[in-house]
Amino acid sequence: MKKRALPIVIFVISLQQSSQSFAVLDLLDQLFHKILNLSSRSISCSNCLKHRLQIPYFCSLHKGLNTVHKFRSLRTFQQCHELSKSNQKCHLSVMTRQVLRSRIMRALPLIKESLLLAQFLQ
């Protein structure tokens, strides 16, 4: 299982260093969510065209593609949805791409160490 995770992480890092086009950023979003093992059930906001993340309690409202709002419950998600209807700013907590990247970077040494150990034990 861990052997499959490493190429994804390496791919994310190589994408970080390439041009930051919208397509690349969209792909990064998808990869980050897969790496963070988020649920696959979906709650989507029909009022926002930019909402592309079909993952519970995550919403890209108000901040476009650069940040995602992370919610602890369905209630806070619905509050954000209501704010979007009236075009108000959402003041809920935001998880930026930089936070997601730093989590992956911190996990890299552990992944590499696990792979080396697995190869040694084979």
Curated annotation (Swiss-Prot):
Signal peptide coordinates: 1-21
Superkingdom of the source species: Eukaryota
Record flagged with keyword Zinc-finger: no
Chief location of this protein within or outside the cell: secreted
Entry GO CC: extracellular region; host cell endoplasmic reticulum membrane; membrane
Extent of motif RxLR: 72-75
Domain comment as written in the entry: Has the canonical translocation RxLR motif, but lacks the canonical EER motif, which characterizes most oomycete effectors identified so far.
Family: Belongs to the RxLR effector family.
Record function comment: Secreted effector that dos not suppress the host cell death induced by cell death-inducing proteins.
Protein name as it appears in the record: Secreted RxLR effector protein 80
Origin species: Plasmopara viticola
